[in-house]
């Protein structure tokens, strides 16, 4: 087997989860020689603007995909939620390993439960999806934009006027944060996760048989089935980072149960549909069609026009 060059974003979380995946791969292939190549993406360079206002898709993957085309890397390790639902020609997801915790984590300055936050309390998030769901259930709260890595956001919670912040549980777990910092984990019934949240997507060239065979050894079929339902829904709804869109699928016995959600950013319009079955593409499609019939597509079209 040739030496493998792996592409990763330069952030601490990206490098940590990349190393964790490599360790998983090396347990299956102890003699594998592998090296990480750090790549800065457009999304990494945009630090003072809300990503939903930038528009476009693939803000955290395009430069890495170019490295795949150029042949300077052999595969790329992405957070699946950053990967557009339609991949460029010649590239494929070679594997999706076992998913981490898909939930969101609510962290309050004084560990005040979410339902006890007083009117006007400030909750920090970089996600329209989280903001819309919070405003739907707790319209008395104020949502304030926050960016930065986990350390930066926790420091802002401590030092600035935020009463609480919401982060992805998967990122906290991968970075080794103690669960005691989390005030409460938000179950999908309360806060539906982003499409693909908690999962990694390992992207490679479609014609690289050697790498595809290597990646297959750490692929998880259950995670693939669930995320395929989610990503089918995302693709059909043409969801992007300027649309509050969410979706989460789980296996219930032999069946895939998927719930999709589309909201207006202010939380006042809400479309939520659940379907279950054995075929992930059919389930994602059924939820998307039900959404269109209910009028959810109008929210997306309006928001896309505003960019």
UniProtKB/Swiss-Prot annotation:
Biochemical pathway: Porphyrin-containing compound metabolism; protoporphyrin-IX biosynthesis; coproporphyrinogen-III from 5-aminolevulinate: step 2/4
What are the recorded Gene Ontology BP terms? protoporphyrinogen IX biosynthetic process
| InterPro entries in alphabetical order | HemC, Porphobilin_deaminase_cofac_BS, Porphobilin_deaminase_N, Porphobilinogen_deaminase_C, Porphobilinogen_deaminase_C_sf
Coiled-coil annotation reads none
Q: Which Gene Ontology CC terms are recorded?
A: cytoplasm
Q: How does it assemble?
A: Monomer.
An additional note in the Swiss-Prot or TrEMBL entry is: The porphobilinogen subunits are added to the dipyrromethane group.
The record's similarity note reads: Belongs to the HMBS family.
Full protein name:
Porphobilinogen deaminase
From what organism does this protein derive? Answer: Macrococcus caseolyticus (strain JCSC5402)
Q: What is the lineage of its organism?
A: Bacteria, Bacillati, Bacillota, Bacilli, Bacillales
The gene behind this protein is hemC
């Amino acid at each position: 087997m040739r030496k493998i060059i792996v592409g990763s974003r330069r952030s601490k979380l990206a490098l940590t989860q990349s190393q964790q995946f490599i360790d998983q791969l090396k347990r299956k292939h102890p003699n594998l020689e592998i090296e990480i190549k750090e790549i800065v993406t457009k999304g990494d360079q945009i630090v003072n603007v809300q990503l939903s206002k930038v528009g476009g898709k693939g803000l955290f993957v395009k430069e890495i995909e170019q490295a795949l085309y150029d042949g300077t890397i052999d595969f790329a390790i992405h957070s699946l939620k950053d990967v557009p639902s339609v991949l460029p020609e010649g590239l494929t997801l070679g594997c999706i390993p076992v998913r981490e915790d898909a939930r969101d984590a609510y962290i309050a300055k004084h560990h005040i439960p979410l339902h006890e936050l007083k009117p006007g309390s400030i909750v920090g998030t970089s996600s329209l999806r989280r903001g819309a769901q919070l405003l739907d259930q707790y319209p008395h709260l104020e949502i304030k934009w926050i960016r930065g890595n986990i350390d930066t956001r926790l420091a802002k919670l401590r030092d600035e006027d935020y009463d609480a912040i919401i982060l992805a549980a998967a990122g906290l777990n991968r970075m080794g944060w103690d669960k005691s910092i989390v005030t409460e984990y938000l179950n999908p019934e309360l806060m539906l996760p982003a499409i693909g949240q908690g999962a990694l997507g390992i992207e490679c060239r479609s014609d690289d048989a050697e790498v595809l065979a290597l990646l297959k050894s750490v692929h998880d079929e259950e995670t693939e089935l669930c995320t395929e339902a989610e990503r089918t829904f995302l693709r059909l709804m043409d969801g992007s980072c300027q649309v509050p869109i969410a979706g989460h699928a789980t296996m219930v016995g032999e069946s895939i149960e998927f719930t999709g959600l589309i909201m207006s950013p202010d939380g006042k319009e809400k479309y939520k549909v659940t379907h279950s079955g054995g075929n992930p593409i059919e389930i994602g499609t059924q939820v998307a069609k039900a959404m269109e019939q209910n009028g959810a597509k109008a929210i997306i079209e309006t928001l896309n026009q505003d960019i």
